[in-house]
A protein has these predicted regions:
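Active-site and donor-binding regions of nucleotide-sugar-utilizing enzymes
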Residues: 28-29, 39-195, 200, 224
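Alpha-helical structural motif
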Residues: 5-12, 171, 201-204
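Positively charged, low-complexity intrinsically disordered leader regions
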Residues: 1-37
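A short helix/loop element that forms part of the nucleotide-sugar donor recognition site in Leloir-type
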Residues: 27-31, 197-213
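Glycine-rich phosphate-binding loop signature in dinucleotide/nucleotide-binding domains
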Residues: 36, 103-106, 211-214
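Conserved donor-binding/catalytic core segment of Leloir-type glycosyltransferases
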Residues: 41-45, 209-225
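Residues that form generic nucleotide/phosphate-binding pockets
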Residues: 19, 156, 208-211
Length: 226
């Protein structure tokens, strides 16, 4: 629903939320570094403890698309594993900070993980024409006080996403009740680290491939004899 929020009236709850946010002082957002040349994919990962899977996803995306840089914003202190992955803090919800963040990074696509919505930041990205996708959406990511007492805020904000991928059946059921029916919602598995291929000598790989000759190989790992 790319333009849905722009064409539909905003709920009273969302208007009230945005008015309250404007009363706070901006934090004067300062980016962690200059924007790199080329395309930038922004991943926001508010859930803690999933850094390995997050970095694995970012590395795979960079490997598949030449010149791509991945910007990761998170609620925990992360250290970038390589030059193409950029770590930064997400801006506050004040309009001045969200504007500074988006004008600096100019993301080509945004991938929001888990939940814990930042309505002003998501709305600002949507209105700038940034394609938004939510993946690995978890039930706990939509269980804070605002979602319970002002479900219309989440309903308006979720309309900004083109696709929403839930990690579990309970999360899918929760989002189905929370979201508008015209937003794409699918059930997928959780985001997990898949592991990256280790460096190897091409000559060794060629020799092993020739020896195997296409025969199936059975690998038994971490097993013990009885």
């Amino acid at each position: 629903m790319q333009d849905g929020l722009l064409k539909m009236p905003v709920s009273l709850g969302l208007k009230a939320y945005r008015a309250l946010v404007r009363r706070n002082l901006p934090t004067q957002y300062v980016p962690s570094q200059d924007r790199p040349e080329g395309e930038v994919l922004w991943i926001h990962a508010p859930e803690k403890g999933n850094a390995l899977a997050l970095f694995d996803l970012a590395k795979r995306l960079c490997a598949q698309r030449h010149g791509l840089s991945v910007l990761i914003t998170s609620n925990e202190a992360l250290v970038s594993p390589c030059a193409t992955i950029i770590i930064d803090a997400a801006p506050s919800e004040h309009p001045q900070d969200t504007k500074a963040f988006l004008e600096h990074w100019q993301p080509n696509v945004a991938l929001w993980l888990w939940g814990e919505l930042q309505p002003n930041l998501i709305l600002a990205a949507h209105r700038k024409g940034v394609p938004l996708i939510m993946a690995d959406a978890g039930q706990q990511g939509f269980e804070n006080r605002r979602e319970r007492w002002l479900p219309e805020v989440a309903r308006d904000v979720m309309a900004c996403f083109q696709n929403v991928l839930a990690r579990t059946e309970p999360a899918h059921a929760r989002l189905a009740k929370l979201m508008r029916s015209d937003v794409s919602l699918e059930l997928c598995g959780p985001l997990m680290a898949g592991g990256q291929s280790l460096n190897y000598a091409q000559s060794d790989f060629d020799d092993l491939s020739t020896t195997l000759g296409g025969r199936p190989v059975w690998l038994a790992a971490s097993v013990q004899s009885n």
